[in-house]
């Protein structure tokens, strides 16, 4: 896969389930997800496909510079509007009807619900900003949504795009072998994940909970649900405010609250 060239030719990936186009001046950063882990495997299987569009390839200056001074003055530089605009337009020509997402600290906070919604699009273009940001006109005329992965500043949108792609890819059929692994992840059902244990049975005098060694699958399921609720209640109580609890979950949560009142 060539990471530094835009490609508008027809591809052989007829079975691809989801397409990503990345607008970035640092496509090499994405080797972390194109060559490794479940995303790397999914690309090799043609389950997902990633194309890169580098604004530097759309510049009209010999230095291929992609930064410019902001009108009105102020600190820092902005990404040059024209190369970025052309990169996005070319990505749109490749992925017809794709949704365009700009990674920005001003965007809506990314969560599991948004990930599950965006998968329906099948074609996604991520715009990775740099410097102090991008021209507002690009956002107004080319961007459909702005996403943020948290209330902190990064040097660019590439890391945020990788986070989003990794999370989205997990829900594409065939990427994760065991569907149950995805369904039991934190946030999938609105709760944090339960504690996990593996061999050996004892580490530094700390034992694996006996219930997990019992072989009683119903009791194990109940224990895990209780621990999941307990984790969520103590670490992320905000998640419970928006979750419609099942009868069993309500009973277990009320028991936890009573115990902690003692």
UniProtKB/Swiss-Prot annotation:
Q: Which SUPFAM superfamilies match?
A: alpha/beta knot (SSF75217)
A GO cellular component annotation in the UniProt record = cytosol
Where in the cell is the protein located? Cytoplasm
Q: Does the keyword Methyltransferase apply?
A: yes
Instruction: Say which enzyme class the record assigns.
Output: transferase
GO process annotations (BP): tRNA N1-guanine methylation
- State if Flavoprotein is listed as a keyword: no
Any GO MF annotation of the entry: tRNA (guanine(37)-N1)-methyltransferase activity
Disulfide-bonded cysteine pairs: these are none
| NCBIfam families reported in the protein's UniProt record | PRK00026.1, trmD
Q: How does it assemble?
A: Homodimer.
In the record, the note on similarity to other proteins reads: Belongs to the RNA methyltransferase TrmD family.
Q: Report what the protein is called.
A: tRNA (guanine-N(1)-)-methyltransferase
* Organism field: Buchnera aphidicola subsp. Schizaphis graminum (strain Sg)
Name of encoding gene: trmD
